[in-house]
Amino acid sequence: MRTMHLAAAVASALTLSTSASAGFFDLTLAPYVGGSLGQATSDISCPVGISCDDSDTAWKIYGGLEINEYISMEVGYIDLGESTFTGTQSGTRETNGMTTAVVGTYAISPSFILSGRGGMNFLNTEVNGTIAGTSTQNTGDTDVVWSFGVGAQYNLTPAVGLRLDWERFFETGSSNFNGGTGEADIDLFSAGVVYKF
């Protein structure tokens, strides 16, 4: 009897394992598009004598391919807004560019999905401003910027969903503020709509 119970338990475990594996390797290849609007906040450190406003409206658009129910790939364009600085130097610092990401998802229910993402992004940071009343000076820096994020999605229909995301973009710009763009992490909180074909 004990042997039969053990055999039944092993068979049940193998069935669950096979079912999970089938879900992971069951390709869906479903394309989708989306757009989000939110607020970006930079942690840039301003030198003495300069005051910085580090928050601004930000937005992004993207297209993706759902590989299976757990993994998707995304490519998009993002505008992380601008920081403004005043004092002995005055002007703006803005960051935008192309984004790529691998997105992992887990469905709590057919309507509610949790997500986590890791991205490699190609972002350009530009500073336009003046120093002590001199003529406008422009400085730019384009880098590979890594990002991480988490989010949630609520599906209104099988095709339309509402998405909330938090993302952090690490070390945008260059490390030197004077004569450069300054280096900063940028946090983005956004809400948007996604449409699945």
Which ranges hold each PLM region?
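Short, aromatic- and cysteine-enriched interfacial helices/patches
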Residues: 24-30, 48-50, 170, 179
